[in-house]
């Protein structure tokens, strides 16, 4: 038997080696699956530790000889991790050669090998197909400029963000002073784009916007205080938007709030985050419609028509993009050096204008992680045609950055990996005096619950008025959410996605560990009963989260039924907590 297994091991080694050329050439999903199937098939045939040593030796040899191929490296790692512990033998010893493994991963990160869209997509699809949920592709390895890290290290770094679930987005800039109106015309939609919408050149825009923007000291503290009252765990302020107006002092460039208005808004915001123990995030636009070195030619990036005309008339130089990338790096360095940064929300890229070519992404990431190694970043330093799509909404792959971003959209089935949905209160990010299309507290809580139940975070926006005051409608909505969160936040914070892969007509489900489920009920059926496809092993207790009142629970072979007849229901969303060891009945 031992001799037979050795032959099998050798056959596997030869087969996998022959596959390797295909994987290197195609980085394909099918080839990854074939290698994985043969690896697990070989391992499953062995009966003893000695036999496994022979089989695993062949895997270890593949690992050592092909550690510069990221696809093979990941597949072999999965082969090891899915092998029974008593059968790991020589392979485990090979993986203990830490210096060799670290050097291999470092080389991959430095070379950008894991940047390959084909590799990233294939590996992620591979993991999903085989339901290897606890062994995910290392999204951060392959982000040029970001250090490689283990899954354990990544989980630790991402923990506060994954557990926090709810954040406040704050769009405040020079555009806020215009309040949606420019030269007598009212603009609709996202009015922070008003220069683009109006087509104004830089000089015209400055003349109109600067006098109407009047930031007052102390307003940033009001934003963060409201976020705290609403139950937010983090906030994200626009440190600069596409108009290029910096909301912090930038000594090398005078188009900033400190030099034009005498106040450093980012500084006050940073101090407020510290005061209220709030994680401080910064939106950082990579565009700059008005910087003299910004060159949008041939990029497909939006650009105000007036600036194009000024260039054509010789009144404005065409940009020098290498100098612009240095400018981006310089002002980002100012932000990092002067304010505590927990999160960076980059914006934005296009298929033909992204990454190093467009923004110097490698250097920007290196700046961030050299200064703040535990910082978190979204994925918008890059853009890709090879990304998830649902209903025409495209999402950049998470493996470029720490998390995906869905804007003005909540994906019906969530997004693989870490992700966040950002939403507005009334359809615009910046302040608009005429826009009164406010959502309700109920609608917003349901959006929050929908996102969290699908495994994401929810970033909800406010657009302060010209002086920085928060519109009274925004205050009321955030306080309304805060009231609900104070009573029901346990069903949101530190939870993970609905484990059943189906949604229910009566509401949503979140979970905490493997012994707690939260049923968030939007609409109770006329029967007064709701059901979920699970059964409990041993004792199970159902209670109303708000008042701890016990609820009747019964089980059958197909479902668990909760009877809420006669129970007081929350007009926004009622939460029932189920405590007990459960298992899904969905095959």
Task: Report each predicted region and the residues it spans.
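Amphipathic alpha-helical repeat scaffolds of TPR domains
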Residues: 33, 70-78
